[in-house]
Structure formats: structure tokens, C-alpha cells
From Swiss-Prot:
Keywords: Cell cycle, Cell division, Cell membrane, Cell shape, Cell wall biogenesis/degradation, Glycosyltransferase, Membrane, Peptidoglycan synthesis, Transferase. Belongs to the glycosyltransferase 28 family. MurG subfamily. It comes from Streptococcus pneumoniae (strain 70585). Cell wall formation. Catalyzes the transfer of a GlcNAc subunit on undecaprenyl-pyrophosphoryl-MurNAc-pentapeptide (lipid intermediate I) to form undecaprenyl-pyrophosphoryl-MurNAc-(pentapeptide)GlcNAc (lipid intermediate II). This is UDP-N-acetylglucosamine--N-acetylmuramyl-(pentapeptide) pyrophosphoryl-undecaprenol N-acetylglucosamine transferase.
């Protein structure tokens, strides 16, 4: 039986594509393994998926671009993670390793290359993260969501592979209940803060609940169960799975962070959106770059977190609603999306 090892983690964005691809390989008779951190979100997501995947936990350390005494400790963690991954590779002898990035992916990628296993990696953002910059040196091939510099000879631009489904499923009962609390004469605004929510969105909704619910139906994915609430024109919930796409479709506008996975999902369904990227003080600036790209393409509006107020947000919402057809036409004309089926066939071809 053919074997494939997946890796990637730290955030849902570094796991999502793996979760989409693994069932395809399982259906085609592959034995699927995953290398990650048992304390990480990758382990949680695989357990929730119920997929027949063998999980191997390794030591992992954070790769920092700045000086920290923790770098010394993490060097040893990464080194031990490489040794652990090497033993896993030598024991399994897989046909390939597929990496979606994140700090936990570096040891398996290095170990795979050392043990002669082909390495395929995927980069979602406009600029490569530190983990994938390291991984690229050991990769057989990298697939990218955005166009990359021509000097990167191992990169193939494939566009975004999203988890948005074309299949229309019956409305969940919970969605019907939510809609019964909404005023259908008002536009619906969905706040999406990533897998852990976004405190800035949560605070905005909390501070301006009255004003917001007078003018909009508000859906707030918070990442915090203490904020859960269903009331007139307001639905706040910490986490959703089956409700995710129905809520996306229900919304007239989405206010989101600038993670590539989420914004390309919105592009795939031509959904109006305002991007509030994580600032450089909290990230390497990849979300700012992603947001600027989407604004330049005419897909979205952006708003820096430092400028986010009720008034500034309402100005963006009003602009999007009044120019809805223009934004949607540009999104529908995009050629930057790839279906899961097409990407899977491309990957299988490259593996052969």
C-alpha cells in the first residue's frame, strides 16, 4: 500500500488544505500519516474529522526572526523534532510528504529530504513565511496561491484551493432558528476572526452592540464561548463547523482578518468583504500584503486595525453595499481559484 505523510499546523490555515486532501488519498487506497504536535490545532482538527489517519507527535519550537533567549531552547526542540521525524520516515518509508507550512512542518520536511522522500509544499500567502522559506530549500516542488518571483524555480502557481463547496446541502435547523431572530430588511454582517476569533472584532461588537443591531443583523464568530448569544439581530458563537458555509452565504458582507484561506473562500463565492489585517506588531505583515493585493484587484476594501472604529467600519460597509455589482463582477471574473479535484489530480500527477 502506498503511504503519504502530511504535516502542517499551528493555525487552522496550516491544516485546512491537508484536511481536504487526506480523504481523497484515503479513498484512493493510500495509507495516510500526519506529523505534528499533539498539543497543536492540527491534532484537534484531525480528531474532529474522524479520518483514518495515524498521527505522529514530535517536538517543535517556534522560529523567531528576532532575538530571544527562547531561541536557544527551541533550537534543541527543532533538532529533536528532526531526529524524531527521521525515525518516522525511515520506519514508514512513505512515497511522499506534503507540507502546508507552520513551524511544526520544518523538522518533517528536513527529515524527508534527508531520507530521500520527495517533498511537496504549499504556500498560501503573497510572501513566504519563515517556515516555508526554510522548507523550500528542501522541497521537490512548491505550489503557490499567489504568483511568486520567477527566480523561485521550484514554484508552480496554482491559485487558491478553498474548502467552499459547490454542493447545496439542506439548511441546518440551527440556521433557521438564527434567521428567525433576524430582521430581513437589514443587511447581515459576519465577523470572522480566524480559528481563535479576533478580540478587536469581539470588542467592537460588545462596545457597539446597540448601534450595530439597529442597522444590521450581526453574526460574530468569537472564539470565546463566554460571548455566545442569540438575540434580536445578533448571533455570537465561539466556533462552527457545518454552519460555517451557510453563515457565509447568509451574510451580505463579511468583516475578516487577512488570512489567505478565508479571503479566497470569500472570493470563491463572490462575497463582499472588508479585510482588517493583523498588523506588523502581531505578524510578519503577510495579511497586510494579502489585503493590499485584494484591494488592488478590486475584490475588497481594507481597514487597518488602528483605524477600526464604528464610524470607519460603517463607511466601508456603506461603500461596498452601494457598489455591490462592481465588486462582485470583479470577483466572479477572477481566474485565481482552483477546484480541489483539479489540484488533487495535479498533485497525483506530480507524485507519479
Amino acid at each position: 500500500m502506498k503511504k503519504i505523510v502530511f504535516t502542517g499546523g499551528g493555525t487552522v490555515g496550516h491544516v485546512t488544505l491537508n484536511l481536504l486532501l487526506m480523504p481523497k488519498f484515503i479513498e484512493d487506497g493510500w495509507e495516510v500519516h500526519y506529523i505534528g504536535d499533539k498539543r497543536g490545532i492540527e491534532h484537534q482538527e484531525i480528531l474532529k474529522s474522524g479520518l483514518d489517519v495515524t498521527f505522529h507527535s514530535i517536538a517543535t519550537g517556534k522560529l523567531r526572526r528576532y532575538f530571544s533567549w527562547q531561541n536557544m531552547l527551541d533550537v534543541f526542540k527543532v533538532g529533536w523534532g528532526i531526529v524524531q521525524s527521521l525515525f518516522i520516515m525511515l520506519r514508514l518509508r512513505p512515497q511522499t510528504l506534503f507540507s502546508k507550512g507552520g513551524f511544526v512542518s520544518v523538522p518533517p520536511v528536513i527529515a524527508a529530504r534527508v531520507s530521500g522522500v520527495p517533498v511537496f509544499i504549499h504556500e498560501s500567502d503573497l510572501s513566504m513565511g519563515l517556515a516555508n522559506k526554510i522548507a523550500y530549500k528542501f522541497a521537490t516542488k512548491m505550489y503557490s496561491t499567489f504568483e511568486q518571483a520567477s527566480s523561485l524555480s521550484k514554484v508552480e502557481h496554482v491559485g487558491a484551493v478553498t474548502k467552499v463547496s459547490d454542493q447545496k446541502n439542506p439548511e441546518p435547523d440551527e440556521l433557521v432558528d438564527i434567521q428567525s431572530h433576524f430582521n430581513h430588511k437589514l443587511p447581515t454582517v459576519l465577523f470572522v476572526g480566524g480559528s481563535a476569533g479576533a478580540r478587536v472584532f469581539n470588542q467592537l461588537v460588545t462596545d457597539h452592540k446597540k448601534e450595530l443591531t439597529e442597522r444590521y443583523n450581526i453574526i460574530n464568530l468569537t472564539g470565546d464561548s463566554s460571548l455566545n448569544e442569540l438575540s434580536q439581530n445578533l448571533f455570537r458563537v465561539d466556533y462552527v463547523t457545518d454552519l460555517y458555509q451557510p453563515l457565509m452565504e447568509l451574510a451580505d458582507i463579511v468583516v475578516t482578518r487577512g488570512g489567505a484561506n478565508t479571503i479566497f473562500e470569500l472570493l470563491a463565492i463572490a462575497k463582499l468583504h472588508v479585510i482588517v489585517p493583523l498588523g506588523r506588531e502581531a505578524s510578519r505583515g503577510d495579511q497586510i500584503e494579502n489585503a493590499a493585493y485584494f484591494v488592488k484587484k478590486g475584490y475588497a476594501e481594507d481597514l487597518q486595525e488602528s483605524d477600526l472604529t464604528l464610524d470607519s467600519l460603517e463607511e466601508k460597509l456603506s461603500h461596498l453595499l452601494s457598489h455591490k455589482e462592481d465588486y462582485q463582477a470583479k470577483m466572479k471574473a477572477s481566474t485565481e481559484l482552483k477546484s480541489l479535484a483539479d489540484f488533487y489530480q495535479l498533485l497525483k500527477k506530480d507524485l507519479s
